[in-house]
A protein has these predicted regions:
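A general structural motif
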Residues: 44-45, 75-77, 184-194
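Short acidic (Asp/Glu) and glycine-rich catalytic loops that position anionic groups and cofactors
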Residues: 61, 94, 169-175, 202-207, ...
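Metal-coordinating catalytic core of metallo-dependent amide/deamination hydrolases
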Residues: 1-166, 176, 212
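His/Asp/Glu-enriched, well-ordered alpha-helical/loop segment
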Residues: 190-228
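Aromatic-anchored helix/helix-loop segment that forms the rim or "lid"
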Residues: 168-192
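Generic recognition of flexible, low-complexity loop/linker segments
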Residues: 52-55, 117-119, 183, 194-198, ...
Length: 228
């Protein structure tokens, strides 16, 4: 099935977005953790990730499975990300916009950096690569196939409008305008977490400079980010 999909779509690689979560959202689940079963099909994100990463390996694709994991942007998703890394030990995978998956729940605001723990786990597993998804301050728009998380993020839309839709009853899409503010505690910490990850991952060939355009910032902000 994976090989047929690649051929039919004339694609170069496989990416999975919130594995199982987009479908679960259609059955009124508003979250789906790594070992939480989809209410309709009884499949967990862990099973999906292991099956897809094995298929990519067996097909000999040059690019590893591209993973947008569970619980993007959720305080405490650090634990989910670490569990995901451990589950995929020995398999070639690429973790996307890892900054958005590196949040703890410490402190008065119940929001903290998990960058050190993520970097430690990545440094210990040479088969994993990642891109940062750096946040830059200013106006942008978030665009994602992760309807579940875009629905949750719509409460913070700036300006107050958003769109979510079902793509051919088979996938998801959400677009939410957003403004990152340097005087906002959460936004400022997101900015710092991204920079921490750049500095803490030992192998520069396994960590890539991105803003997850346009979700963390438009790519036109790259010169400023590089200067940082």
């Amino acid at each position: 099935y994976v090989a047929w999909t690649l051929c039919a779509a004339q694609a170069l690689a496989i990416k999975v977005v919130n594995p199982g979560g987009i479908n679960a959202f259609k059955y009124n689940q508003r979250k789906l953790d790594l070992d939480e079963a989809n209410a309709a099909y009884g499949v967990t994100p862990r099973q999906i990730l292991l099956s897809l990463s094995a298929a990519v390996s067996e097909l000999g694709l040059p690019h590893p499975l591209h993973i947008h994991g569970c619980n993007l942007g959720v305080p405490g998703n650090l634990a989910t990300t670490l569990d995901t890394i451990r589950a995929l030990d020995g398999l070639r995978v690429h973790l996307t916009h890892i900054q958005f998956h590196s949040y703890g729940t410490e402190g008065d605001h119940k929001f903290s950096s998990g960058a050190a723990q993520i970097a430690e786990a990545v440094n210990a597993q040479p088969d994993i690569s990642l891109d940062v998804g750096q946040v830059m301050f200013g106006q942008t728009v978030t665009e994602s196939g992760d309807t579940m998380r875009q629905f949750a993020g719509s409460a913070y839309a700036d300006p107050k409008k958003w769109v979510g839709m079902d793509i051919e009853c088979d996938a998801g899409c959400g677009v939410v305008p957003f403004r990152y503010k340097n005087r906002n505690f959460v936004n400022a910490l997101q900015w710092a977490i991204g920079l921490e990850l750049f500095l803490l991952v030992d192998d520069p060939w396994r960590i890539f400079l991105t803003t997850d355009h346009p979700n963390g910032a438009p790519f036109t902000s790259y010169p400023h980010l590089i200067r940082l």
